[in-house]
């Protein structure tokens, strides 16, 4: 039985569910879950939690992501990416804008911004996914969402050809960000229709492309009984949270029993959640959170016995 976090390189053409389904067959275990959907035409890092690490999948998902995308100015699509039907075209020429204009524009997207999720997305409205409305040719009001663009920049020259302009960007962002919507919004600010024509996720949950294994590599390592060496411990998935190392055996026992604590029993100022780590084994004991009605207390959220 495997336990840990496995960064998978998802190839284009596969859904995130396809990856999990194939891994369950390869590893012969059902206790597997991915940490955030990647669209079929998107390649890149997809951290997968296996065994006891499935308990920290939400935390891996919250750790932020990085992407490299190609923005195509001059044509918009129904899906906001290269897979959709054309909605609008407008010829683009090198006299319309230059790379300095693009760089200044990208700066304006840094920070907390509002996005309207695309119709072809899994965001739910009134209990129904948006893509279900889209497939039935139904329109529905999509709620604006705040997302965090931590960094964004151009990483290629502008390529003007066939009445369109293409350039690559790198984006570091929080969860829930739609890069294809970002591409169309860049076009709106330039005064042109636009879409995202290619996307690769280069980092997710602290894992980068060089950490990631293809399904074929995973199959080979499993057959060689050496896959466990490539898995990251569940502790890695919690590195985004503050932590305290516990030495006292009596306190360790209380934590593992799921007892409440007064915050002032610990030196650290606990604001929201805290991870307790065994000082001897370096293993996670539990995740605690501030009590919702008694701010001076902390209570267990997850205990790892």
UniProtKB/Swiss-Prot annotation:
EC primary class: isomerase
Entry keyword set: Isomerase, tRNA processing
Q: Which Pfam families match?
A: TruB_C_2, TruB_N
Q: Keyword check for Magnesium, yes or no.
A: no
- Tell me if Transit peptide is a UniProt keyword of this record: no
Please give one Gene Ontology molecular function term for this protein: RNA binding
What is the active site of this protein? 39
GO terms under biological process = mRNA pseudouridine synthesis; tRNA modification; tRNA pseudouridine synthesis
Q: Look up the EC number in the record and give it.
A: 5.4.99.25
Stretch forming the signal peptide: none
Q: Which reaction does it catalyse?
A: uridine(55) in tRNA = pseudouridine(55) in tRNA
Instruction: Quote the InterPro entries the UniProt record gives.
Output: PsdUridine_synth_cat_dom_sf, PsdUridine_synth_N, tRNA_psdUridine_synth_TruB, TruB_C
Q: What job does this protein perform?
A: Responsible for synthesis of pseudouridine from uracil-55 in the psi GC loop of transfer RNAs.
Annotated family: Belongs to the pseudouridine synthase TruB family. Type 1 subfamily.
Q: What NCBIfam families does the entry give?
A: TruB
Q: What is this protein called?
A: tRNA pseudouridine synthase B
From which source organism is this entry?
Staphylococcus aureus (strain NCTC 8325 / PS 47)
């Amino acid at each position: 039985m495997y336990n840990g976090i496995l960064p998978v390189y998802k190839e284009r053409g596969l859904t995130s569910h396809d990856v999990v389904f194939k891994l369950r067959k390869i590893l012969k275990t059902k206790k597997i879950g991915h940490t955030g959907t990647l669209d079929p035409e998107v390649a890149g890092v997809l951290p997968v939690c296996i065994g006891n690490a499935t308990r920290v999948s939400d935390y891996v998902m919250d750790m932020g992501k990085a992407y490299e995308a190609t923005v195509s100015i001059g044509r918009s699509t129904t899906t906001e990416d290269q897979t959709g039907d054309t909605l609008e075209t407008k010829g683009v020429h090198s006299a319309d804008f230059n790379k300095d204009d693009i760089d200044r524009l990208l700066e304006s997207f840094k920070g907390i911004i509002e996005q309207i999720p695309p119709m072809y997305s899994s965001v739910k409205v009134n209990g129904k996914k948006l893509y279900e409305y889209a497939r039935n040719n139904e329109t529905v009001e999509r709620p604006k969402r705040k997302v965090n663009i931590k960094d964004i920049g151009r990483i290629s020259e502008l390529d003007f050809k066939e009445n369109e302009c293409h350039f690559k960007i790198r984006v570091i962002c929080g969860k829930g960000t739609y890069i294809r919507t970002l591409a169309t919004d860049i076009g709106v600010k330039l005064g042109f229709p636009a879409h995202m024509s290619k996307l690769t996720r280069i980092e997710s949950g602290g894992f980068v492309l060089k950490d990631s294994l293809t399904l074929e590599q995973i199959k080979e390592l499993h057959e060689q009984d050496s896959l466990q060496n490539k898995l990251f411990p569940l502790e890695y998935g919690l590195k985004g949270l503050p932590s305290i190392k516990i030495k006292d055996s009596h306190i360790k026992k209380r934590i593992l029993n799921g007892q409440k604590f007064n915050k002032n029993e610990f030196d650290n100022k606990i604001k929201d959640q805290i991870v307790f780590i065994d000082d001897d084994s370096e293993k996670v004991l539990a995740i605690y959170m501030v009590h919702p009605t008694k701010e001076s207390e902390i209570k267990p959220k997850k205990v790892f016995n």
